[in-house]
Amino acid sequence: MCARYQIDINIETIKEIFAEIERRFPGVVMSTGEVYPTDVAPVLTRDGPAPAEWGFKRRDGKGRIINARAETAEEKPTFRNAFRRGRCVVPTTGFFEWTKDKHKIKYLFELPDEQLLYMAGLYEYIDNDLCMVVLTHAANESVAGVHERMPVILTGDQLTLWLNETDEARQIIEMASPPLRKSPV
C-alpha cells in the first residue's frame, strides 16, 4: 500500500511540471512536500500534466480508494475503464511506508542516483474532478522488510509506453520494481 509520497518542489523537472499545470489550469493549488490521500497533486497523462485528487471517491460517499492492485486492476469494475483509457504517471521524489510493529518507524523509499521516482497510476473523472489511484504490486526486496506491497515504479523509458500502449502496460505491471534506497525519517 502507498498512503503517502513526497514531492520536492526544488527538483527542476518537478518545477517544470508544476509550471505547465499552472499554465493549463490557472489558480490550481497543488500539494508539495508530503502528499496525503485527498490532496491535489500533479499527474502526467496522454494529454499532458494535470492536477488530480489522490483517491477515487467511493460510490457510497464514504472515503476514498487510494491504491489499486496491479494484478487485478484491469478486471475490477472500479478500475477497468481507467486501466484501459486512464493510465497516468505520478511524479514523486519518493514514497513513505511504516513498519507494522508496536513502535512504527517511518521510511522514505527513493531511487538511488535518481531525483525522481515515477509511480504508475490510474485516473478518471468523478463528479467533474480528476481523481487518481496508485497501482501497487508485491514488494521487492528493498521494501519487503517494511511492507508487503509497494507502488509500481516506472523507469523513464516506460513512461510513454505506460500512458499509450495497453499491451505494454500489462507487461510493465508484471515486472519487478527496481531496487530502492530506504531511509528512516
Give the label of every model feature segment.
Residues 1-185:
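Short linear sequence motif anchored by a di-proline
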